[in-house]
């Protein structure tokens, strides 16, 4: 997994360099490429997304931390939403 992350990072940087070289000095393209490369770089090293903790609002079970489920707040109609509960 670590090798894949490094490979993706290198590919992103190489693609950014290629676009910069082919852009003929157009500043808007450079700005977009730098922003995209920085965004991908930070996403790769930020790690996995954090989970939703107990008694916080949710929409799906996958959002909740381990051993928690996204359950209805009010049993009859669920109009008030859902929260992560054990």
Curated annotation (Swiss-Prot):
PTM (free text): Contains 4 disulfide bonds.
Keywords tagged on the record: Disulfide bond, Secreted, Signal, Toxin
Name of a matching Pfam family: Conotoxin
GO molecular function: ion channel inhibitor activity; toxin activity
Tissue expression profile of the protein: Expressed by the venom duct.
Propeptide: 24-49
Origin superkingdom: Eukaryota
Entry's localization field: Secreted
Residues in coiled coil: none
Membrane-spanning residues: none
Entries under InterPro entries matching the protein: Conotoxin (IPR004214)
Signal peptide from the UniProt entry: 1-23
GO cellular component: extracellular region
Chief subcellular location: secreted
Family listed: Belongs to the conotoxin O2 superfamily.
Domain notes: The cysteine framework is XV (C-C-CC-C-C-C-C).
Protein name: Conotoxin Lt15a
Source species taxonomy: Eukaryota, Metazoa, Spiralia, Lophotrochozoa, Mollusca
């Amino acid at each position: 997994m670590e090798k894949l992350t490094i490979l993706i990072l290198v590919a992103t940087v190489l693609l950014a360099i290629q676009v910069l070289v082919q852009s003929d000095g157009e500043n808007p393209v450079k700005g977009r490429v730098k922003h995209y490369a920085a965004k991908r770089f930070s996403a790769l090293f930020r790690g996995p997304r954090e989970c939703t903790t107990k008694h916080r609002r949710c929409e799906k079970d996958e959002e909740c931390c381990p051993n928690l489920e996204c359950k209805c707040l009010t049993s009859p109609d669920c109009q008030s939403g859902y929260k992560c509960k054990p």
